[in-house]
């Protein structure tokens, strides 16, 4: 909203014109979210400790996790608050793509909050019943998918971009809604599954959001979009502001979530961040790119699917424990080693994903 104020003030002082530059707003969006998160962290942690809102730890999990019992959770509230305030300050309020992401971020944040509340306040280890969680995730995702389809149905916004092939961009039509639904819900739950170690989920989220910031900038620039053979989407540029806000809020949260964590994000953070990343990927027409850059989330999810499927079909487990990060813990890897190695893999996958934009 400060952009509109700056457009008015530029009549009196030309220096306010700097607010119209996307690169400037991207930088200050990151810094704003980072500062808010760093400021809010100690206050939120102290408040959660006062309310005794602590993490519930599985009794069948790694023994090293027992010491985490009671660590404040629902720290994702600081992430959501930081992102929302930063985006509202620095993005154009008239941009429909921005509102689609915020709708998912806040909507999934509410679902996650209810789940966390039932777990840590009402001491219900199962939290929100799975079918109700999936129901509300579906309703919110479908509402966003219909909105996104209505915005872009007559533009390249409903084309499917296939990596490595510049001339293969099938028009999805109404199938766009179905694809958007699965990407949003799937990514939300994938990030949620990954959030099992200190800092494990937030850093890959930061990497992927940073990668999408570059993609959004290119997609919203007619010259670079043509150069990379990706659809030009005039609303896409403002998603840079959203992505950098996620990066800033994520780094601020990591300050308190790094090993040994002072706070966990909880479902209020993981479901919301995953949903936001999925929505950004759909809006940019880069669902396949999300699979590559978010490969850590994909592998974590597949490990759970394979583990459950193998046990039901053969009565045997593939991994010592799923998601796969627990498998490595039970193999004797120290938690920091698992975390940092997953970070390195995530960064590599983001760089590989960005490289595919040119390899066509």
From Swiss-Prot:
Transmembrane segments: 26-46, 72-92, 94-114, 132-152, 168-188, 199-219, 236-256, 263-283, 288-308, 338-358
Gene Ontology terms describing biological process: cell division; cell wall organization; peptidoglycan biosynthetic process; regulation of cell shape
Recorded GO CC terms: plasma membrane
Membrane topology, from the record: Multi-pass membrane protein
Gene Ontology molecular functions: metal ion binding; phospho-N-acetylmuramoyl-pentapeptide-transferase activity; UDP-N-acetylmuramoyl-L-alanyl-D-glutamyl-meso-2,6-diaminopimelyl-D-alanyl-D-alanine:undecaprenyl-phosphate transferase activity
Keyword NAD: no
Enzyme class: transferase
Pathway this chain belongs to: Cell wall biogenesis; peptidoglycan biosynthesis
Protein name in UniProt: Phospho-N-acetylmuramoyl-pentapeptide-transferase
Originating organism: Yersinia enterocolitica serotype O:8 / biotype 1B (strain NCTC 13174 / 8081)
Gene for this chain: mraY
């Amino acid at each position: 909203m400060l952009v509109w104020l700056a457009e008015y003030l530029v009549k009196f002082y030309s220096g306010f014109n700097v607010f119209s530059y996307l690169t400037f707003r991207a930088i200050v969006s990151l810094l704003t979210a980072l500062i808010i998160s760093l400021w809010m962290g100690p206050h939120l942690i102290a408040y959660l400790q006062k309310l005794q809102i602590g993490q519930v730890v599985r009794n069948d999990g790694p023994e090293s996790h027992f010491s985490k019992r009671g660590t404040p959770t629902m720290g994702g509230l600081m992430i959501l608050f930081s992102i929302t305030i930063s985006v509202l300050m620095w993005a154009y309020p008239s941009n429909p793509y921005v509102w689609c992401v915020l709708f998912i971020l806040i909507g999934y944040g509410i679902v996650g909050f209810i789940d966390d509340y039932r777990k840590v306040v009402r001491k219900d280890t199962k939290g929100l019943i799975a079918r109700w969680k999936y129901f509300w995730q579906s309703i919110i995702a479908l509402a966003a998918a219909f909105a996104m389809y209505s915005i872009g149905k007559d533009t390249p916004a409903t084309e499917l971009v296939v990596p490595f092939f510049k001339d293969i961009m099938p028009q999805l039509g109404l199938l766009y809604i179905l694809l958007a639904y699965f990407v949003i819900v799937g990514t939300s739950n994938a990030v949620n599954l990954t959030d099992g170690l200190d800092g494990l989920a937030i850093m890959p989220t930061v990497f992927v959001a940073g990668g999408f910031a570059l993609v959004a900038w290119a997609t919203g620039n007619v010259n670079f979009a043509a150069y990379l053979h990706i659809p030009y989407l005039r609303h896409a540029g403002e998603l840079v502001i959203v992505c950098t806000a996620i990066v800033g809020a994520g780094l601020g949260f990591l300050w308190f979530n790094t090993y040994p964590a002072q706070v966990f994000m909880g479902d209020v953070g993981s479901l919301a961040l995953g949903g936001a990343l999925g929505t950004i990927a759909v809006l940019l027409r880069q669902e396949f790119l999300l699979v590559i850059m978010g490969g850590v989330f994909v592998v974590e999810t597949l490990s759970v699917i394979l583990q459950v499927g193998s046990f039901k079909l053969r009565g045997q487990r593939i991994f010592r424990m799923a998601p796969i990060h627990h498998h490595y813990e039970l193999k004797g890897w120290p938690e920091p080693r698992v975390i940092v190695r997953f970070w390195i893999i995530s960064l590599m996958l983001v760089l590989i994903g960005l490289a595919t934009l040119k390899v066509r």
